[in-house]
Amino acid sequence: VVLFISVNQILLFLLVLTICVILYNKVHKVPSTLNNETIDLESPEEMEEEIPVVICAAAGRMGAAVAAISSIYSNTDANVLFYIVGLKNTIPHIRKWIENSKLKEIKYKTVEFNPMILKGKIRPDASRPELLQPLNFVRYYLPLLIHKYEKVIYLDDDVIVQGDIQELSVGMQNTYMGYLDYRKQTIRDLGISPSTCSFNPGVIVANMTEWKHQRITKQLEKWMQRNVEENLYSSTLGGGVAISPMLIVFHGKYSTINPLWHVRHLGWSPDARYSEHFLQEAKLLHWNGRYKPWDYPSVHNDLWENWFIPDPSGKFKMIRPNS
């Protein structure tokens, strides 16, 4: 009997010990898991999604790209990677500008655009030669320049971003009348009403999967070639030959955004157009048109100068009345 009691006591002791061990593990498991999660969040594998932003850096107006990048970087905590696209002779300049200014902290890659890809696809037009610059066509070739992203943000260099770039979505509103030459039968045959709302392709969030699936670049090149043959888009119309093919190809394939994310036409006239209060509330300002904020005359250039970083090499200078 004594032996029997001793065995039961031992078994009871082991049972109690097992329960204690289980309870101990349960109590201490939660903080252990939290610690692991904290480490994982800080590890490269679990970092927040990277936001690719494409901006062109053109000779003669490189300060525009710098100001745009500065405004984006200063107004977000997002993980932004800038793809700065330029021609071979401009890339060393923009690199030096970034590395010798407060922008040296940004994440960026420089991408060389080869203008030979446009050979035979652009019709010469002397009325607005600046619209024929090769970098105006970079947006046609986004999947060839940037490979690994589902979405890519493309911005013209004459913008200032006052909001958080994470909020940016897609869509604009203009009308097609100002871009396509409706005197041409080929344009009329498209069935696009002149009063149909269009978008401004200076601010784009592009779905790269659909772009590749629908062979958008090939479609754009087709309409470039048609213009060489038929002169469908005059440079005297808004945007010239770079914008018009995009309006045709993307007709009905885009969505709208909050108007504060694209306050445009600031470069259409040297006279003030918007109230200061409205401009302060705007998320993105766009000086599309002839009157650029680094030039003179221009409007609301103080909002642009807030983000401009002087060129360490002294090559780029703003033009002001007293300069």
Regions found by a protein language model. Name each.
Residues V1-S323:
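Glycosyltransferase catalytic domains, chiefly GT-A lineage
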